[in-house]
Amino acid sequence: MICLVLTIFANLFPSAYSGVNERTFLAVKPDGVQRRLVGEIVRRFERKGFKLVALKLVQASEELLREHYVELREKPFYSRLVKYMSSGPVVAMVWQGLDVVHASRALIGATDPGDAMPGTIRGDFCMEVGKNVIHGSDSVESAHREIALWFREAELLCWEDSAGHWLYE
């Protein structure tokens, strides 16, 4: 029940729903799944201290992907992106924690792996922009939209993280 109230509040007042309760959407793309990188990616987010709220392995439909990447529809690579993302399974996840949207972008690294720093996911595991292993929400607003697109409300687990008091003051 408390999760439902928090989610409704977050959707009505996204700028107020931040801090340790901020959520982001991540998706390990088909190349990351095929290369068996899911565990390593989850490990990095857990070690950072973020809380996993939802995770599922899905074969994303082109319809879902067109909606997900709607802001890129005018780009020349849009059709290739949708085809690539629907070419195999995707691991969709929701993570929660302090400034998780911004921090997850730093963990992921630059979109173009050539610009990604060593130590980031893309810096360590990617060679080219067309196969860059992972998607991460670029803003709190995008995270709300993407989470609602990929997950039903009942799939978002609200649980008490016993390590929280070791992470936050």
From Swiss-Prot:
The subcellular localization recorded is: Mitochondrion outer membrane; Cytoplasm; Cytoplasm, Cytoskeleton, Cilium basal body
Work out whether the entry's keyword set contains Mitochondrion.
Answer: yes
Q: NADP: is it a keyword of this entry?
A: no
Identify the SUPFAM superfamilies for this entry: Nucleoside diphosphate kinase, NDK (SSF54919)
| Outcome after substituting residue 89 to S | Strongly reduced nucleoside diphosphate kinase activity
Task: Give the positions the UniProt entry annotates as the active site.
Answer: 135
Q: Which top class of enzyme applies to this chain?
A: transferase
Provide the catalytic activity annotation.
a 2'-deoxyribonucleoside 5'-diphosphate + ATP = a 2'-deoxyribonucleoside 5'-triphosphate + ADP; a ribonucleoside 5'-diphosphate + ATP = a ribonucleoside 5'-triphosphate + ADP
A Gene Ontology BP annotation from the UniProt entry: mitochondrial fusion
UniProt keyword list:
ATP-binding, Cell projection, Cytoplasm, Cytoskeleton, Kinase, Magnesium, Membrane, Metal-binding, Mitochondrion, Mitochondrion outer membrane, Nucleotide metabolism, Nucleotide-binding, Transferase
An MF annotation (GO) of this entry: metal ion binding
Q: Which GO terms describe its cellular component?
A: ciliary basal body; mitochondrial outer membrane; mitochondrion
Q: Which CDD domains match?
A: NDPk_I
Which PROSITE patterns does the annotation name? NDPK (PS00469), NDPK_LIKE (PS51374)
Q: What is known of its domains?
A: The N-terminal hydrophobic region (1-17) is critical for mitochondrial outer membrane targeting and phosphatidic acid binding.
Functionally, this protein is described as follows: Catalyzes the phosphorylation of ribonucleosides and deoxyribonucleoside diphosphates, other than ATP, into the corresponding triphosphates with ATP as the major phosphate donor. The ATP gamma phosphate is transferred to the nucleoside diphosphate beta phosphate via a ping-pong mechanism, using a phosphorylated active-site intermediate. Through the catalyzed exchange of gamma-phosphate between di- and triphosphonucleosides participates in regulation of intracellular nucleotide homeostasis. Inhibits granulocyte differentiation. May be required for ciliary function during renal development.
Q: Which NCBIfam families match?
A: PRK00668.1
Can you name this protein?
A: Nucleoside diphosphate kinase 3
Q: What is the lineage of its organism?
A: Eukaryota, Metazoa, Chordata, Craniata, Vertebrata
Source gene?
Nme3
